[in-house]
Regions:
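Conserved SAM/SAH-binding loop
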Residues: 98-106
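Glycine-rich phosphate-binding loop and adjoining beta1-alpha1-beta2 segment
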Residues: 46, 51-89
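Glycine-rich phosphate/adenylate-binding loop
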Residues: 2, 21, 110-114, 121-126, ...
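Conserved N-terminal Rossmann-fold NAD(P)-binding element of oxidoreductases
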Residues: 27-29, 52
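N-terminal charged helix/coil linker that caps or initiates catalytic domains
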Residues: 1-25
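Hydrophobic/small residue at the entry helix of a nucleotide-binding pocket
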Residues: 33
């Protein structure tokens, strides 16, 4: 019988799709990486998504963020994301959270049981706390590292953080995670050196500069992240 996920079932099999339909994945951060990760998860028939982002869409998001359109500027990313996911799959259960994840409010985000977490958070302190909490709670997690100031999407890869190099964020994360006793973490990252950029926009409070971006690098990172999540969730289920 024809259905919206038939072409995926032809590759993965019905047991894998049944497994995905019973999974709950949380995506923290719905920017250039997270918006595409959530999209692929919804189109892979993941049955339940928690989508976390405190921001509203702005004009400068349009170059790289899936939900950013002239018609959605000013709307909350999490709400636009949830609406789109429901349009893809009316049976999906979506929980949009227009809030900031941090250590002080972490318990607000773990009310449900997650089968996987996609970490697309920008702030290092929040990122580290989420990773540590996932480990303590036994939840698999994959983290996106830096995709700004990069041009070549073919250099992106899914690997362990212990195998990363060049990326400044990876270097900081390795050090901070070691201090927390965490040696291994699945990440999406690129060893591409940062491109030379010009500062044409004032940085937000707490940032020294605004990362430059192109449409094709963050989106590819999000797709790779979702692919890794789906394939890990259905390991041993494909026919």
């Amino acid at each position: 019988m024809e259905h919206r996920f038939l072409r995926t079932e032809m590759v993965l099999g019905d047991r894998a799709l049944d497994r995905l339909s019973r999974c709950h994945v949380a995506v923290f951060g719905l920017g250039g990486v997270g918006s595409y990760a959530a999209e692929i998860l919804a189109r892979s028939e993941v049955g339940e998504l928690t989508l976390v982002d405190q921001d509203t869409l702005s004009l400068t998001n349009i170059n790289r963020q899936l939900y950013a359109l002239s018609s959605t500027v000013g709307e909350y990313k999490a709400e636009v994301a949830a609406r789109r996911c429901r349009d893809i799959n009316p049976d999906i259960r979506v929980h949009p959270l227009c809030a900031t994840y941090d250590a002080a409010h972490r318990e607000d985000f773990f009310a449900g049981k997650f089968d996987y977490i996609a970490d697309c958070i920008d702030l290092v302190t929040c990122k580290l706390d989420l990773i540590q909490q996932a480990g303590e709670r036994g939840i698999p997690i994959i983290s996106a590292l830096g995709t700004g100031n990069k041009l070549d999407p073919t250099l992106l890869q899914v690997t362990d953080i212990s195998r990363t190099s060049v990326c400044p964020l990876a270097r900081v994360m390795r050090r901070e995670l070691r201090d927390r006793g965490i040696r291994h973490l699945q990440v999406v990252y690129s060893p591409e050196p940062a491109a030379e950029t010009r500062q044409l926009e004032a940085p937000s409070p707490g940032r020294r500069s605004v990362p430059a971006s192109v449409p094709w690098v963050p989106s590819t990172a999000g797709i790779l992240m979702a692919s890794a999540i789906v394939r890990n969730l259905i390991a041993n289920e494909s026919e």
